[in-house]
Amino acid sequence: MSIFRFIDAEKASYPVAMLCRMLGVSKSGYYAWRTRPTSKRSREDVNLTERIREIHSRSRETYGYPRVHAELRLLGVRCGRRRVARLMRAAGLRGCMRGKKRRTTRRDPRAAPAPDLLRGNFVAGQPNRVWLADITYVPTQEGFLYLAIILDTHSRKVVGWSMDTHMRTELVVDALEMAIWRRKPSAGLVHHSDRGAQYTAISFGKRLAEIGIVPSMGRTGTALDNAMAESFIATLKTELVHRRRFPDREVARSAIFEYLEGFYNRRRLHSALSYQSPMSYEEATMEGAAVA
């Protein structure tokens, strides 16, 4: 902010003459600045800032300047990243900062885990090749709400989820059933998780086998072995859970549902997807496959 702009902002509280004297500028210089026509660049900055505010608001105030810049480009607005960053700083707009994920699942020492088939390689050229699963909890004033999710590694889309008051095996089975119903995967798809007791349970393994899904498991509590799912959980916590206080589980359930299905899958731009939403990225993949 320039000295003259600061004086203009504070003149309702302090005399202009005093402000000019304290800041070492002349009154005539201030009034000349006030009557000077606004530059084209300044007018453009004002208009661009309004567009930025709209995008930031639609993102639930979660987007930092890279995603805001990406959405501006999608809207046909040409401007540089540094300009967007500067205008966001001036407007007091910022994205969300991630916190640290806490361990949720616990390993059953009696269970025999499946081998790690991915070894940290989560790349899939098509949908329904590799799914990643994880569990987290959401605190409410009524108690914890537990959430199980399944991501498709190709698009980062949440293809299955389940919420309940417990984190027994039924929680992850329900998420799996949603993913199966939605996606109707072919045999050979890899389902990757950590070695938590819910995923090593006999009933869960049996359901995978019935569909022809191949289990893969990283080490429990080791983020790199299931990094993409862990990253999604961190995003959910940062952009929703840590910014709200939920009075009960039902309110939390509704908010999470709207975040997953109304925002994340459909609208949230993902840096790893060339700043497309998971749904848009999948649609582009399918269109490309149809043309080929």
Model-inferred region functions:
Residues 1-292:
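Charged DNA-binding/catalytic regions of mobile-element recombinases
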